[in-house]
Amino acid sequence: MKIGIQVFVTDETLTPNEIAVLVEDYGFESLWFPDHTHLPSQTSTRHPAGYAQLPREYARNLDVFVALTAAALATRHLKVGSGVCLLPQRDPILTAKMVASVDYLSGGRLLFGVGAGWNLEEMQNHGVDPAERFGLLRDRIRAMKAIWAEDVASYDGRYTSFDKIMSWPKPVQRPWPTVLLGANGPRAIQSALAVEADWLPGRHKDHAGLVARVREFRERSDGRLGVTLSDPYLDPGQLSALADAGAERAFFLIPASSRDEMELHMGKIRKAVDGIASP
């Protein structure tokens, strides 16, 4: 199993390039940055993890594509990933250009994780109807794939339409970078399969259920699509079982306020995954 690190990179942490060099030096396969454009000062939406108050880094994180570019240009082999880009809140033509640009500048090292979002007020501030976000997500993935794959692209969907547009650079990864759909709900597997995306499940309390779902996804995709685990429990036995079921990667969320703090957490992860991690 490939092992990565996830960090909320903000104006109060190490810079993305400093973080990336450290993560690569420790031998991790990938580095992931979340995506929030802002934090509403008043929100009735509860965090999926049940926080009583949303962490301050949600309002302070750097733009995900700027951070990924800095991380990629500071390293040689480290894969860089969005974990996850809130695609319903972004223009698909502009985002396709940004994704392709990062993949081009990184030499094909981008992993494009996407999600529908969970903070209702945040998406409403972008003019997104929360009830439409899952349809928007699927529509925009398909539209962006057309832009990446075709020299002259057209798309006519429910939420996105354009006719005969040209956009370069094209991604180094052809026909497009790896797209991973972040979702945990009962329709998560079907949603990922519908847009030909890898599955990116978050932490599950039901370990046996997650193992079964990973195996189901791999079987239903005939092994063509992968599974990456977002911040699973750091339990060697559970990770080994998930790897056996077909999960190819896991990344773990750690703080990054200082080099010492990062090294402490990365050392613990390295020790826990010894014997599970693959190059």
Positions of PLM-derived features:
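Active-site-adjacent structural elements that line small-molecule/cofactor binding pockets in enzymes
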Residues: 1-279
